[in-house]
Amino acid sequence: MTITGQINSETLNNGVPIFAPPYRWSKHWPRFTDVNCITIRYRTDGSSIRQYIPDNLQIEETPIVTIMLLDFGFSVIGPYHELIHCVEVTYEGKKYNYSFLLILDNEEACIGGRELLGNPKVLGTIEFDRQNRPPTAFIHGRVLRPSNTVIADIHFKPLCLVLDAGESKTPITGLNLRLIPSLIPGAPPSVREYTNVDFTLQGGEVWEGVGSLNFPSNSEFEPLHKFPVLEYLSATYHRGAWVEQRLLNVYSF
């Protein structure tokens, strides 16, 4: 005699393990509050990074790179820190910020971002504590992976307040490669698509200033050093903002 399980297999639509999914599908895209963020934009050497870019994307000879260091104060998956590293590309005539590497310290955010949106997220150690600052104007954070190896140092020095609460809105139009290989040798991937995701910082204070980046590690596993700084373009610090993220489109190829 056998009995069947009680979970409806035709309506399963969450992550695994199914008895405690790390995220749940919802019609409401996640929001994050009490967010602090350093954003630095710079130009890099296209010939140095083209080896990391799919051939259906185009980049300039000196493409724009955006690096963001975030302190998410609160969300449905709790507080955490994250480094976002992306490069400007063109896909089918439109410009996007192609996600190269995201490092964070929250397991649920890592799993959900990878599986749902194709974000290239990995776990790491991020030191970006708003309460523990040196007695100077500098705001500093650093990223370690593995935990004893610094791969990125980020500095920001504020110069002026440019927008007050409620007026600021900074959208980042992202493009992620969502790729799930097939288990069958020689078969095409089970999933291969680009996801177009809007990531918007809103509200709070926006400070303009001077940014400085250093990538001290030469690791081939996290090759941030292959994105050298040729020219700094801008540096800002969002304080007490909130973030909204939503899917705009999916492009299969």
From Swiss-Prot:
Pathway: Mycotoxin biosynthesis. GO terms for molecular function: carboxy-lyase activity. Disruption phenotype: Leads to the loss of T-Toxin production, resulting in low virulence for maize. The keyword Ribonucleoprotein does not apply. The keyword Lyase applies. It is an enzyme of class 4 (lyase). Keywords: Decarboxylase, Lyase, Schiff base. The active site is at 121 (schiff-base intermediate with acetoacetate). Its EC number is 4.1.1.-. Belongs to the ADC family. Decarboxylase; part of the Tox1B locus, one of the 2 loci that mediate the biosynthesis of T-toxin, a family of linear polyketides 37 to 45 carbons in length, of which the major component is 41 carbons, and which leads to high virulence to maize. One of the PKSs (PKS1 or PKS2) could synthesize a precursor, used subsequently by the other PKS as starter unit, to add additional carbons. This is Decarboxylase DEC1.
